Amino acid sequence: EHLNVALQCGGSDAWSGITSNPSLGYAADLIVKNGGTAILAETPEIYGAEHMLTRRAITPEVGKKLIDRIHWWEDYTARNKASLNNNPSPGNKAGGLTTILEKSLGAAAKGGTTPLNDVLLYAQQSNKKGFLFMDSPGYDPTSVTGQVASGCNIVTFTTGRGSCFGCNPSPSIKIASNTEMYNKMVEDMDVNAGKVISDNKSIEDVLSLIHI
């Protein structure tokens, strides 16, 4: 009940939505079902997959809060002569992601399957437990900062392309989506979810390696 876990990703690839993100989502479900809290963030990176979260909203009002934040980001990017469809990044594309929809479906998988209990503004704290969403940019250092400010005491971070990101205020658990990248960055990674592909392991097998 004292765990408040940030669900985060950076440098995603085509394997992220198949291995590391569903594994983290499974872990998030167990945390929530045992009285803890798990907070997903990065609003622009669920664009196109927001229905997967709103249909889990505990009330229509909670679902509307998420849609309102999506609309804010649509307006913000339009005012700056850009579009949320400009995502994914060149690195994501090099890793096999071709559209924001593919990226968003994978990103949403980190949130597991439990009800969405609240939608928070950036760095906003809440007295609610369970699965929450926090509005933030799609830039992991900024997003994680907001999650920690909102009360997260552990950061879980999935990556497919590789990332040296760490968070000094909170312990960080790094989860690789593929074995090749894990082996190249083994000193920066904690869990190899790529074993789902390379070693024919199950999501449950990977979960046993995520010690939270």
What is the predicted role of each segment?
Residues 210-212:
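Conserved small/polar residues in nucleotide/adenosyl-binding loops
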Residues 8-170, 174:
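Glycine-rich anion/phosphate-binding loop at the beta-strand->alpha-helix junction
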